[in-house]
From Swiss-Prot:
Pathway: Amino-sugar metabolism; 1,6-anhydro-N-acetylmuramate degradation; Cell wall biogenesis; peptidoglycan recycling. InterPro entries: Anhydro_N_Ac-Mur_kinase (IPR005338), ATPase_NBD (IPR043129). PANTHER family: ANHYDRO-N-ACETYLMURAMIC ACID KINASE (PTHR30605:SF0). The keyword Transferase applies. ATP binds at residues 9-16. Gene3D superfamilies: 3.30.420.40. It catalyses: 1,6-anhydro-N-acetyl-beta-muramate + ATP + H2O = N-acetyl-D-muramate 6-phosphate + ADP + H(+). It is an enzyme of class 2 (transferase). It comes from Microcystis aeruginosa (strain NIES-843 / IAM M-2473). This is Anhydro-N-acetylmuramic acid kinase. Catalyzes the specific phosphorylation of 1,6-anhydro-N-acetylmuramic acid (anhMurNAc) with the simultaneous cleavage of the 1,6-anhydro ring, generating MurNAc-6-P. Is required for the utilization of anhMurNAc either imported from the medium or derived from its own cell wall murein, and thus plays a role in cell wall recycling.
Length: 378
């Protein structure tokens, strides 16, 4: 079955689009990437999305218009990826997250992904599955992360313990015990580790007065020295101490949050590069701390994906904090494209929904039950 996966994450870089061929059975899928492309948002739309993610208020009418505009660009991405390929039979669209509230006490969580599937299906004339997180949240789960089940099927190893570490705007991990271990699927864990690129990107935009949107390959940060005392202070953030299941987003790690980190740094007389190096170290240490604090064992291998996988300085700092016994790779090195891994994941989640196969792992999200994820629009 030919399926398109569409994904735009918390970095709001653009629409990651993957055309994949899925064969085999739902419980033993074979996935081949036929084409992958990231289509940038139009500048005005990206700016509006970032403003909304930052807490800017919209009228209901403006929100509806934003939803339609995002859906139109997602639909165009799906049409573009097929121009030199066979027509897809199904689309799985994550949409654009603009708000995420984890569950608390007796209150269900809440999440908003814009770019409605009904509009994508109408424009493309291809059945579209979207709103993947809602069913898990209705079962008292976080609705995130949803990728661990895909990681289990595509990236687990017979004898090695692995972690898959996505470093997008937010970092999230999947812990994969060896497949030969008894009841290994019940022992899979996953959660959001904290900031991935989000604070680094916001800082680069601030320091460059909007001329740069990210630290290319970590070159700016690599010119500085992280301030250990300052990073230790930042690590007192309660989220880092919270036990899984847990999820987070730009609602916490926001421009206002970065402004506080900037204020904290004033007492240390840091250069711009030192501050960026410290923010990069915060991401690296928060990931390593998550592993060392919450995992039953350290992995033999960590497989990186997402934009942060291309940041050489971040990789260097992460390896330093994880320790020499951990091998750091990208998912490319084990056969899964790291740039389009999330888009591939939502193609497979759509395929599972189409075939009535549950897509969540309750022990990961905190949901009461495994459920079908996504709503089908024809």
């Amino acid at each position: 079955m030919l399926v398109i996966g569409l994904m735009s994450g918390t970095s709001v870089d653009g629409i990651d689009t993957a055309l994949v061929e899925i064969s085999g059975t739902v419980e033993s899928p074979q996935v081949q990437l036929l084409a992958g492309e990231t289509y940038p948002y139009s500048p005005r739309l990206r700016e509006t999305i970032l403003q909304v993610c930052g807490g800017e208020k919209l009228s209901i009418e403006a929100l509806a218009s934003l939803d339609d505009n995002i859906a139109a660009e997602f639909a165009q991405a799906a049409l573009n990826i097929q121009k030199e390929a066979p027509k897809a039979q199904l689309i799985g669209s994550h949409g654009q997250t603009v708000f995420h509230r984890p569950p608390a006490n007796d209150r269900l969580g809440y999440t908003v992904q814009l770019g409605r599937g009904a509009a994508i299906a109408k424009i493309t004339r291809i059945p579209t599955i979207s709103n993947f997180r809602a069913a898990d949240i209705a079962q008292a789960g976080h609705g995130a992360p949803l990728v661990p089940k895909i990681d289990a099927y595509l990236l687990s190893h017979p004898t090695k313990t692995r972690c898959v570490q996505n470093i997008g705007g937010i970092g999230n991990l999947t812990y994969l015990p060896p497949r030969q271990r008894e009841n290994w699927q019940q022992k899979i864990f996953g959660w959001d580790t904290g900031p991935g690129n989000v604070l680094i990107d916001l800082a680069v935009q601030f320091l460059s007065q909007g001329q740069q949107t990210y630290d290319h390959n970590g070159q700016w940060s690599a010119q500085g020295q992280p301030c250990s005392e300052l990073v230790h202070k930042w690590l007192q953030e309660p989220y880092f101490q919270q036990y899984p299941p847990k999820s987070t987003g730009r609602e916490l790690f926001s421009p206002a949050y970065l402004a506080q980190l900037r204020e904290d740094a004033q007492a240390y007389c840091l250069s711009d590069a030192d501050w960026l190096a410290s923010l990069t170290d915060l991401t690296a240490i928060s990931i390593a701390h998550s592993y060392q604090t919450f995992l039953p064992e350290m992995p033999a291998e960590v497989l990186l994906c997402g934009g942060g996988a291309r940041n050489a300085y971040l990789r260097q700092r992460l390896l330093a904090h994880l320790g020499s016994n951990v091998k750091l790779l990208t998912t490319d090195e084990v056969g899964l494209n790291s740039d389009f891994k999330e888009a591939i994941a939502f193609a497979l989640l759509a395929y599972w929904r189409w075939h009535n196969f549950p897509g969540n792992l309750p022990q990961v999200t905190g949901a009461k039950a495994a459920v079908l994820l996504g709503e089908i629009y024809r």
